């Protein structure tokens, strides 16, 4: 006689019971952390933001602070005082990078990662669009990164083989976050404004510039240009080309300027920062075509991002009537469509310009991309190193380099205050 035993069901029930007991044990610690985040208006990021947005339990809190050194020490002291004779006796604050990154461990477990809000020129903090989510634990409205920034974080990791072990979980997060994100905006194709007649008039000149931009193996095509020219989707006002380069962005400026000058093409070039808090090193080179000396007759034709200068970017090769060139994988394309959406939202907040219809246009492009039939797994996750373009920087080596440059700060133990600790 054999008896059927639901081994999987028993294991899942046992695991759920263990997790709940573990969570109950540290409930005061978790509640104190959330109350601190709420009181000091910190901004939750990373996987913590995904879980908060999806109303799931959080066990490791990652958040930005506008006063990270003082806040980290204050929170560590609060946690220690919860139960200094037992559970929180071994509370320690570890300085990873002074004034930038701190970790708090309680009972030999990591509970908190605090980051400084990335700075831009003159050390001004990057403006972050406020977004609120209700906590499943305390029912408080907590600041967190908006869904577009969370998706940018997810796509960045899905393009990075260093996070391959996290890909199954990230794909689940991506699906849920994308659904929630798209529910917030109506899907429309219309786009206001633009200079379509001028673009059509100078189409041959613009095409000459674009073909020169995509001819090198050091650049990757992303964005609406792919939708229009490769998938035969009819898009209005989408002569703009979006690229990723593996070269230094200022080198690219000189190369492009030299090409256009030698061919008698009048352009204007500008380099700026899209102000992504998740990616402060990102820069964008923008090219405007100008057939006259009138600035009102200038219009944007190329956006070039410097992502390939500091990280690897997965690519696919496409053959067209105009030749073959590299394009980003679907996750790379999605990432930079969301960058466009973020920039437009920031412009709307800072200048009060009405960018609603343009945002809806890019959201429609994003939805079209994600609803298209998925290519092979190799096209999504290239396994050959030849399919990756850019410069690899070991994140651990980068952290060690930063730590060596700065003064080493010993751990801070709230139970044993030390003036030299932080």
Swiss-Prot record:
Cellular component GO terms held in the UniProt record: virion component
Induction: Expressed in the late phase of the viral replicative cycle.
Primary localisation category: virion
Keywords linked to the UniProt accession: Late protein, Virion
Subcellular localization(s) per the UniProt record: Virion
Domain of life: Viruses
Protein family: Belongs to the asfivirus K421R family.
Protein name: Uncharacterized protein K421R
């Amino acid at each position: 006689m054999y008896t059927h035993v639901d081994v999987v069901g028993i294991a899942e029930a046992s695991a759920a019971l263990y997790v709940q007991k573990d969570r109950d044990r540290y409930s005061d610690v978790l509640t104190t952390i959330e109350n601190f985040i709420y009181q000091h208006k910190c901004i939750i990021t990373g996987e913590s933001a995904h879980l908060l947005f999806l109303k799931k339990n959080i066990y490791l809190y990652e958040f930005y602070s506008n006063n990270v050194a003082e806040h980290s020490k204050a929170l560590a002291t609060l946690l220690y005082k919860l139960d200094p004779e037992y559970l929180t006796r071994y509370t320690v604050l570890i300085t990873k990078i002074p004034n930038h990154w701190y970790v708090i461990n309680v009972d030999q477990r990591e509970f908190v990662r605090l980051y400084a809000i990335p700075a831009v020129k003159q050390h001004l903090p990057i403006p972050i669009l406020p977004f609120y989510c209700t906590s499943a634990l305390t029912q408080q409205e907590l600041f967190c990164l908006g869904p577009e920034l969370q998706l940018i974080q997810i796509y960045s990791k899905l393009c990075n083989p260093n996070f391959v072990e996290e890909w199954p979980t990230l794909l689940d997060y991506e699906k849920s976050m994308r659904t929630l994100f798209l529910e917030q905006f109506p899907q429309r194709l219309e786009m206001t404004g633009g200079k379509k007649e001028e673009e059509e008039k100078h189409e041959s000149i613009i095409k000459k510039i674009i073909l020169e931009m995509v001819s090198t193996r050091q650049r990757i095509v992303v964005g609406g240009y792919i939708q229009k020219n490769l998938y035969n989707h009819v898009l209005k006002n989408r002569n703009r080309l979006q690229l990723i380069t593996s070269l230094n962005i200022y080198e690219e400026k000189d190369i492009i300027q030299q090409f256009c000058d030698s061919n008698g093409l009048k352009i204007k070039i500008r380099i700026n920062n899209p102000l992504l808090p998740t990616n402060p090193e990102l820069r964008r080179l923008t090219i405007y075509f100008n057939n006259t000396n009138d600035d009102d007759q200038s219009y944007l034709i190329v956006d070039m991002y410097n992502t390939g200068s500091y990280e690897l970017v997965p690519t696919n090769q496409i053959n067209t009537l105009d030749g073959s060139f590299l394009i980003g994988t679907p996750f790379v394309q999605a990432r930079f469509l969301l960058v466009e959406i973020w920039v437009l939202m920031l412009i709307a907040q800072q200048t009060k310009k009405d960018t609603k219809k343009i945002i809806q246009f890019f959201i429609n492009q994003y939805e079209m991309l994600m609803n298209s039939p998925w290519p092979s797994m190799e096209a999504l996750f290239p396994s050959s190193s030849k399919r990756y373009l850019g410069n690899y920087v070991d994140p651990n080596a980068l952290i060690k380099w930063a730590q060596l440059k700065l003064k080493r700060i010993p751990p801070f133990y709230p139970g044993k205050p030390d003036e030299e600790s932080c």
